[in-house]
């Protein structure tokens, strides 16, 4: 069966933003105007198609990235609606990895908010081309120009308006299209925004439109020498040349086109769809896919993005579906695959059989026979494939670049309400951990408790909620615990001779290491053994011993991070030496060195942004200071004060309630993980006492 829509007419885009900027509503409108939805649905009524989990509909926020497909002007658009809440960063990260472009939705009232910055940085990491949609133009305080300068200043990008708004707040009627130089106006009685009028630009907007168009043209020609020559030579630049130049500059990440509207009031969405089709890349616009040879990871393999190349795909999400079981979402980067085919999971070196293949529309599904290059689909029946694994043709193995996920920052102990549910809880937690790489489960060796860790209180709340709804396991949850870490502040030279003789064969391992701080590098092991003083086959055992010793630090038993170990000398015994002996020697050497290397405890610190009426500002700043917060800035916006601070996570529990009472419910806050920093000596002592160390 041949593909229905050619690859160059396909767009894979994500809708990304800060929580509450109106992402899901924007996506719902896109589905309505492209004919997928028969009736408009509202997020605040809990009806949104893309928010299909019960918890999402209750809370009115998006937790998982729902994938859906729609069609516009002969193009196929695969859309992923990503969460905006900081606790679900992993969903954004894995979506961006498999997309070709992204629509960044901003609230025209609030501009760039903390989570917008986080998501923007994630998109920078994967070099994802973007266009900006300023939503909520009908709301009080909407300010188009402020949003443009916010993107420039806070995100360091080059926003170029290709529209300007007609009116704002309750006077917002539509937009001026700066390429066509026409007004697009949605009448008040328009049939749910489906019909609009295209008119000549009114006199009072002419000057502003000409001025902004000139800026748009100058920005485009700066990226193209031939156009620049033509433009400054006084020649007219055609509409086709503008679109082509803008498309190239967007794909090259030198320009971010800006459009605006109000999704809730049904204005501006059709023009946004035109911009997606005109300026977002097709899979063919993106460079060749690069991967590595599974047998020799140093060898790079280039793979052409075409249906004729060998099959290669990346699994970017695993989830359990109540009807079909385990679903694996994947993006095809080259070739095609049909249902029932056997493919190779090159990350794990295992063969997998593609059972049914489903095209997802939020949580509705349509069975399909084939998936072609550039498409996103979900497979049933992949038993061993996890997020980030590569699936490929058996005769052309390749491993695509994997995704990196942040480590959890918060933990709680959970136990089932009834003893009978112990086993069910174990199964539920392991299934949920399979779906979400930032959710970890472990058993505390000292207490025997089950500890779950994640990206924030909301993240873990939803996990506990899902256990109850999907797996019928009710649980008691302990107090939140912060994921502290340990590190060292100076270098140390350490020698350990591990020798054991108790009749028969003994144990002998002798190592000399240097342990030194290695900020931001987690763990690094360097082998400087020469002349075979330690045989080559024992070196990995020393590294393994060091790695195991890192799991429990020397101050309070938290993981030891950001260290470098150099193995430079030692000795062995012909008969008594073994891998086990060298592993124990490596572990002992690292522990002893860490004790002498001035160890310290690190704590997760969050960037917090509080928006408050001025009269509560003093109390709120005082409260942040009392939480060991460092206030770094204050600005005015729309009559409110915005306070920025860095606050340790351990001081943020219960903050939402305190903030409500201090501001009579009028202040709001958002936060995102910033970094790990050393705790003060008094806090370190307190942590040690609590841990009984």
From Swiss-Prot:
CDD domains in UniProt: EF-G (cd01886), EFG_III (cd16262), EFG_mtEFG1_IV (cd01434), EFG_mtEFG_C (cd03713), EFG_mtEFG_II (cd04088)
Record keywords: Cytoplasm, Elongation factor, GTP-binding, Nucleotide-binding, Protein biosynthesis
All residue ranges annotated as the tr-type G domain in the record: 8-284
A Pfam family annotated for this UniProt entry: EFG_C
Keyword Cell division: no
GO cellular component terms, A-Z: cytoplasm
Subcellular location: Cytoplasm
One Gene Ontology MF term: GTP binding
Binding, GTP: 17-24, 81-85, 135-138
Recorded superkingdom: Bacteria
BP-aspect Gene Ontology terms: ribosome disassembly
PANTHER family (alphabetical): RIBOSOME-RELEASING FACTOR 2, MITOCHONDRIAL, TRANSLATION ELONGATION FACTOR G-RELATED
Family: Belongs to the TRAFAC class translation factor GTPase superfamily. Classic translation factor GTPase family. EF-G/EF-2 subfamily.
Role played: Catalyzes the GTP-dependent ribosomal translocation step during translation elongation. During this step, the ribosome changes from the pre-translocational (PRE) to the post-translocational (POST) state as the newly formed A-site-bound peptidyl-tRNA and P-site-bound deacylated tRNA move to the P and E sites, respectively. Catalyzes the coordinated movement of the two tRNA molecules, the mRNA and conformational changes in the ribosome.
Stored HAMAP family: EF_G_EF_2_B (MF_00054_B)
Protein name (database record): Elongation factor G
Organism: Fusobacterium nucleatum subsp. nucleatum (strain ATCC 25586 / DSM 15643 / BCRC 10681 / CIP 101130 / JCM 8532 / KCTC 2640 / LMG 13131 / VPI 4355)
Name of the coding gene: fusA
